[in-house]
Curated annotation (Swiss-Prot):
A GO CC term assigned to this protein in UniProt: nucleus
Disulfide bonds: none
Family the entry assigns: Belongs to the proteasome subunit S5A family.
Cited Pfam families: UIM (PF02809), VWA_2 (PF13519)
Domain UIM: start-end pairs: 216-235, 273-292
The organism's place on the tree of life at top rank: Eukaryota
KW Repeat (keyword) present: yes
Any GO BP: spermatogenesis
Name the record gives this protein: 26S proteasome non-ATPase regulatory subunit 4
Function: Binds and presumably selects ubiquitin-conjugates for destruction. Required for protein degradation and ubiquitin-proteasome system (UBS) function and regulates proteasomal subunit expression. Involvement in UBS might be cell type specific. Regulator of the autophagy-lysosome pathway that may confer resistance to autophagy by regulating the expression of autophagy-related proteins such as lgg-1, and by regulating lysosome formation, possibly by modulating elt-2 activity. Required for fertility, sperm production, and sex determination through regulation of tra-2 protein.
Amino acid sequence: MVQESTMICVDNSEYMRNGDFQPTRLQSQQDAVNLVTQCKLRANPENAVGILSMANSVQVLSSLSTEQGRLMMKNHSIEPFGKCNFIAGIKIAHLALKHRQNRNHKMRVVLFIGSPLEEIEMNELVKIAKKMKKEKVLCDVIMFGENESDGHEKFSTFVDTLNGKEGSGSSLIVVPQGSSLTDALLQSSVCKNEDGQAAFGGGGNGMDNAFGMDVENDPDLALALRVSMEEERARQAAAAAANGGAADSGADAEVAAAAAAVPLEEMDMGAMTEEQQLEWALRLSMQENAPAEQPQVQHEQMDVDGAPAVGGDNLDDLMNNPELLQQIVDDLPAANAEKDDDKEKK
């Protein structure tokens, strides 16, 4: 098995907010990054993967690591902003690979491009490609979201320069709008071993590989990742809502109060927001899980209330009235049980 260190360059420009890839370009790209991470780490237990974002100033989110959970956490912390600096991203990824711990590892860059290619000179790309080829650095370029023939031509030349006479090792993958990014990668050389086999089993189902993994092989991890992702999206939505005006907050409070006043059985799920649906489900769960012994507790409370109060002056009266005291003792459940036992013995 080939030992390889891979740096993944993520495009997190403002263009990643577009919804031509469901649910957005960024979230679709994050799922694809998880998929590539899974493939690389499963191909060889000694493989290492790193992640960097390219918006404005390039930022290395995770240096080369074998910890899958850490890489996924860093991946899903990426936010869209600014413009992408692809040239700087490639250079820094190359530099990070040169400082890999295992010098026997092959070096590879996986570059995601989903933004328009602006101010990128062909000569500069070719120069970088020649330097990477000299140092035996491979590169897979995944282009999605923007149908620019000029951009495709530039990076096609970039990949051809990297491959040289051998004609293999690096690849250019163009994913059309409206298709699944993860499904396209599953069918490409990015997620296949040297023998052409997929890095892990499972079909190209977009749902199964939404987090870059085969759900059947590791359902617990898949569920944990989905829950974590939904919690993060809910947190971001709550933070965005909190930044709204006071009027919006007041309106939400009125809606919540009105929802609380309506009986649970009469709630219209279609008319509620996601937050109200969660609150409704919580209230319903609390109602269903109410203690079943509550009526018995109330009955016992009524019995106690019916007994004479023992306190203050009433205590002296009770001690001076042995007949009343005996009556109270006889009424206790334990005393009744003893009487029944005595009758059975007789």
